[in-house]
Amino acid sequence: MLGKRLKIARINAGLKQAELGVRAGLDEESASARISSYENEVHAPDFRLVRKIAVVLDVPEAYFYAVEDGLAEVILQYHRHRKMYRAVE
């Protein structure tokens, strides 16, 4: 689940794997390979890295961990709505 959502969020953000990795603090030489391994669920990032990735992609960490796709979408919509609401205040 995390891999699929990571790839979707990255593509929606218009970033290449290497760009996302570098912005999240990964070494430039291995950034693309590491993000690829996370997207393909060969390896799993630790929570600290997921938090950094979430900041770069502007999605909540919970989006990556929701068991059901429907719940993940609700989490994402809530995040967007909350962000818009705060901008209006």
Give the location of each predicted region.
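The short coil/loop that forms the "turn" connecting the two helices of the helix-turn-helix
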Residues: 15, 26-30, 59
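Conserved hydrophobic/aromatic packing and binding residues within compact polymer-binding modules
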Residues: 6, 17-21, 32-38, 64
